[in-house]
Amino acid sequence: MVKKNTLLICSLAFFSLMGCKGKNELTVPVNLRTEYLREPIGLDTKSPRFTWEYKGSEKNFLASRSEIRIGTSPDNLQPYTDNMTLEPHTRYYWNVTVWDQDGDICETSETATFETAKFKSSDWSGKWITDSHDKEFEPAPMFRKAFTLGKEIEEARVYVAAAGYYDLFINGKRVGENYLDPGYTHFDKRILYVTHDVTS
């Protein structure tokens, strides 16, 4: 009986340790966001904020450490540091790995993306377009330009700035779901812009 009890206690202890480790391995970072947005495009910050949640069977999971890895290719991610320089008009891939309160590594998240836009005025190559009317002229101006692309486009972005509101159409289809973009501001001090993915 003594040998059986000893064997039973050892088996339970071993099972308990393995179960705890297995439980932590099931904890995975989910709902990855950049600047509180999912898969955003048009971020104009060189130091974006990364956030995520935890999904797993452990109710009171507490992470002791996390590591964000980032890169321009999902197959070549490097540890993210505060002094890392992000480039404008670039898609970045990132994921996060966490360690539990005991220092054991947990699952790595799936890879998320974000895309930078313009960081400074010199990143702009477009020029302002306007009608010749005074600002008191009430009818809203409409601008139209026809052009033909000489090659296939892999990806396309449109950056629209307006001293007021705009609606953008390409091939007769309205671009974007929002109205009253790019939003009100003091137009004598700053002009906002919106980024659209118009690849399709």
Task: Name every feature range the model reports, one short phrase each.
Residues 50, 66-68, 166-168:
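Short beta-strand elements bearing conserved aromatic residues within extracellular beta-rich modules
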Residues 49, 91-95, 155-157:
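Short, conserved beta-strand segments of beta-strand-rich sandwich/propeller modules, principally
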Residues 147-150, 154-172:
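Aromatic-lined ligand-binding clefts that engage carbohydrates, nucleic acids, or primary amines
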Residues 115-138:
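Low-complexity, Pro/Ser/Thr- and charge-rich linker/hinge segments at domain boundaries
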